[in-house]
């Protein structure tokens, strides 16, 4: 039996910070000990946490690992490597791959592939289309994290735009619907208008005016209405506007059937950053005004925003060239998501307890993940150790995503991920990832 004692830690868990230690027995947390209490049995390995923060591993509910079919940009192995280095111990991957994850055959193939490739834990969304709503009730709710619904066209063109199909999806899903909310008719009209005024590829600075706040608010409002009409479980992804926050309820997660995610990109950048980063920060929905960013940041200290995800979506740098219409949308983010939000903690925008709630606890509760997301005896030992006082600057040579770049290059951070544990195994330490480790399928108790 393998027993590991992580001692001298500042444990951040369930709204509290306390000095203590954790005993890992094989894959699970066996003991959570306060202060100077010693383990009940001898431990073969002892790790001194040096007073650093020890928290549950981050659960990222929103990634695009591009596998299968787009593996020149990324793949499950490379991106799970980046995840481990960033303190992310579990991910949920989106269906806009090639082939799209819109059939049971494609879904099962992704699970089988991840079992051989992924360093961290994993699950996959099933993609709704205009033609597969009848398949949704047959999905294995204990295995599939949710149904992804594109209510706005984005990378992969999986737009569901027929009202009768939308109603059927909300009625038939039987599990969480994760929705990309942008109204396509508004985007199309804006595209036509900006092309007429500025040519075939308007400057990147016009991206947030083409994929506008109005498009987001209209679509999110429609999704909420459909969810309420069908008593469905709706999770609105990547909220990017102050207007959308007005549609949400500020009450505990346990009391809501409609929840919301904010992404690191919309919390970190704003429209002025297009001047320097240009297409590198082009994403859908677009990064908008400083007022929108500030509203999202303020919402982190409330229950309006339930989860912080990444929308990690790698592309090659050459694919990011061009303006508002030719540069592709999406950026890598998973390796630096935790330290980026820790930077907001350092700035007093949210507390570290709130960070752990929105990046660790809430995804586990919201998706009903079995035995993960908390530091509790009997739970899987998915953990991250964070140095709260280490200044460093992101350089290109530290990027582990296959695409080889990050919009965070040149950013100065003041905290650092020191170690990451997945199912009790130390998978990241001393700037190295254990490439031989394999994660597990997430299981859902529904």
Language-model-detected regions and their locations in the chain:
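Short, acidic/polar
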Residues: 73-80, 130-139, 222
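Histidine-rich, glycine-flanked metal-binding segment
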Residues: 1-5, 10-56
């Amino acid at each position: 039996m393998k027993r590991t004692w992580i001692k001298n830690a500042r444990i951040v868990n369930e709204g509290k910070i306390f000095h203590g230690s954790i005993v890992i027995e094989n894959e699970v947390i066996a003991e959570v000990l306060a202060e100077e209490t010693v383990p009940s049995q001898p431990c073969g390995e002892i790790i001194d946490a040096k007073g650093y923060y020890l928290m549950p591993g981050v659960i990222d509910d929103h990634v695009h690992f591009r596998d299968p079919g787009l593996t020149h940009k990324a793949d499950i192995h490379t991106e799970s490597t980046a995840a481990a280095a960033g303190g992310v111990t579990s991910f949920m991957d989106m269906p806009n791959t090639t082939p799209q994850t819109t059939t049971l055959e494609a879904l099962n193939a992704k699970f089988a592939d991840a079992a051989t490739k992924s360093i961290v834990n994993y699950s996959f969304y099933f993609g709704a289309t205009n033609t597969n709503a009848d398949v949704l009730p047959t999905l294995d709710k204990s295995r599939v994290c949710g149904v992804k619904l594109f209510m706005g066209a984005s990378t992969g063109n999986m737009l569901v735009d027929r009202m009768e199909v939308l109603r059927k999806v909300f009625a038939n899903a039987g599990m969480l619907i994760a929705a990309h909310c942008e109204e396509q008719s508004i985007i199309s009209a804006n595209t036509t208008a900006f092309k007429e005024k500025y040519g075939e590829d308007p400057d990147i600075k016009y991206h947030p005016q083409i994929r506008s706040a109005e498009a987001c608010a209209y679509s999110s409002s429609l999704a909420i209405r459909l969810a309420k009409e069908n008593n469905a479980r709706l999770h609105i992804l990547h909220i990017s506007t102050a207007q959308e926050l007005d549609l949400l309820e500020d009450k505990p997660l346990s009391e809501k059937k409609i929840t919301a995610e904010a992404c690191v990109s919309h919390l970190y950048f704003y429209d002025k950053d297009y001047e320097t980063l240009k297409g590198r920060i082009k994403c859908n929905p677009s990064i908008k005004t400083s007022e929108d960013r500030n509203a999202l940041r303020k919402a982190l200290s409330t229950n309006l925003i339930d989860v912080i995800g990444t929308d990690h979506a790698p592309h090659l740098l050459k694919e990011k060239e061009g303006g508002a219409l030719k540069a592709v949308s999406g950026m890598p983010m998973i390796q630096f998501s935790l330290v980026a939000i820790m930077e907001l903690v350092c700035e007093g925008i949210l507390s570290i307890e709130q960070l752990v709630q929105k990046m660790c606890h809430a995804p586990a509760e919201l998706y009903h993940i079995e035995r993960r997301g908390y530091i509790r005896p009997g739970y899987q030992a998915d953990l991250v150790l964070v140095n709260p006082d280490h200044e460093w600057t992101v350089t290109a040579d530290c990027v582990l995503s296959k695409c080889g770049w990050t919009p965070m290059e040149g950013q100065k951070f003041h905290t650092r991920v020191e170690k990451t544990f997945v199912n009790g195994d130390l998978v990241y330490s001393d700037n190295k990832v254990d490439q031989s480790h394999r994660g597990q399928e997430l299981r859902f108790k529904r």
